[in-house]
UniProtKB/Swiss-Prot annotation:
Belongs to the universal ribosomal protein uL18 family. One of its GO terms (biological process) is translation. This is Large ribosomal subunit protein uL18. It comes from Geobacter metallireducens (strain ATCC 53774 / DSM 7210 / GS-15). The keyword RNA-binding applies. The gene is rplR.
């Protein structure tokens, strides 16, 4: 197995291990994070109904002011956007789902920014 394939398998194992323990409810929905090399995405999902309540990413129009969209500054911007949209819909408490990514760098920056802007987890 190639090193890239091994990396993908390890990420999938981490993702399923984390997802097995985390479940979003109507009272505390799940804040899901996905990152690619170029962008970062965040969604607040109600797992009971299977509906995305709030979403934010570096692809959206609000992030056009960013020069680069795949760095820590962009992740902070997305964290602030998702927290602002969540508070508009009266969502104050969430369960954080790092989606198998290490809690470091962009994922940590997004989480810290969401906390600073009013979300609790």
């Amino acid at each position: 197995m190639s090193p890239l394939a091994q990396k993908k398998v390890a990420h999938l194992k981490r993702k399923t291990r984390v997802r097995k323990k985390i479940r979003g409810t109507t009272d505390r929905p799940r804040l899901n994070v996905y990152k690619s090399a170029r962008h970062i995405y965040a969604q607040i999902i109600d797992d009971v109904t299977g509906v995305t309540l709030v979403s934010a990413s570096t692809v959206q129009d609000e992030s056009d002011a960013l020069k680069y969209t795949g760095n820590v500054e962009a992740a902070k911007c997305v964290g602030a956007m998702v927290a602002k949209k969540a508070l508009e819909k009266n969502i104050t408490s969430v369960v954080f789902d790092r989606n198998g990514f290490l809690y470091h760098g962009r994922v940590k920056a997004l989480a810290d920014s969401a906390r600073e802007n009013g979300l609790s987890f």
